[in-house]
């Protein structure tokens, strides 16, 4: 491992683990966007220590262009990387990849968390095998902050688990509560289970069982009950819990709806001279709205429930987006997210997962991205 130049602003020999291990080779435009993101993140986390893992021959000259990032980073050479289209089973066989080495750094206690813009399926597979799940968590989930009319909310699962049972949904509620406390600063976030209706009789057995368990748990005062799709954007609850299939569809439907809305607005304002003049009047407000819901601000989905912080950046992220993913990871590390989850699991008597029936013990479907 080689070290970036020592400056008065950073002590390379600082005790304790690195804050983050960063996969420098993951993503469509790595390593440039990774380094650009770290350069931006350096202003917000000037004392963070980063273990940058990737091809040293590429990273050393590239890092020289980003002096703020260089002050935070030590470089560790990785001879291989995982492509965006590689299947998880194949990725597991690639020894010495930058993503795998980042996971190994967390498992060994060298770093508190991982950030990568690489292959989602490979990332989850490696995280499960190397970082491993927290005791009491049967399935890690993907969680992220999303905008709503009432302010930011958190939602999970966004694609890590296609099918879930009642216990999984209760675990997601526990992890969602802890993440909302860490990311949004909410002492007692409200929780909703996504369903086809808000009435107690709606939905399937697993949803009703999960609802009953939550109402009988210490989370009961925060449990709102069932919420519907429109409640996500309305911000009815601070945490929205669902299975990975439904969550991923809801997320991407919302993203598509926003693109459609802006496309229609643009078309309307280009209709004639009068509408063009009207656009000039409302342009400042539209720009503020676009900035508020800018997907780059919300980049960074956390694989929550692992024995370490693992954050997935969008593969097509730019520097600003990647910096947002670093922010998510740093928030989780500095607010001791996993300690909050462990404490709540212990309070609920869920220190170990329920036994899995042989038929259910088969490998879960690959996550959707």
From Swiss-Prot:
Look up the EC number in the record and give it. Answer: 2.3.1.274
User: Which cell locations does it reside in?
Assistant: Cytoplasm
* Entry keyword ATP-binding: no
Q: Where is the signal peptide?
A: none
Q: Which UniProt keywords apply?
A: Cytoplasm, Lipid biosynthesis, Lipid metabolism, Phospholipid biosynthesis, Phospholipid metabolism, Transferase
A single GO CC term for this protein reads:
cytoplasm
Superkingdom of origin organism: Bacteria
Query: Subunit structure, per the record?
Result: Homodimer. Probably interacts with PlsY.
Q: Which HAMAP family match?
A: PlsX
This protein is called: Phosphate acyltransferase
Protein's organism: Gluconobacter oxydans (strain 621H)
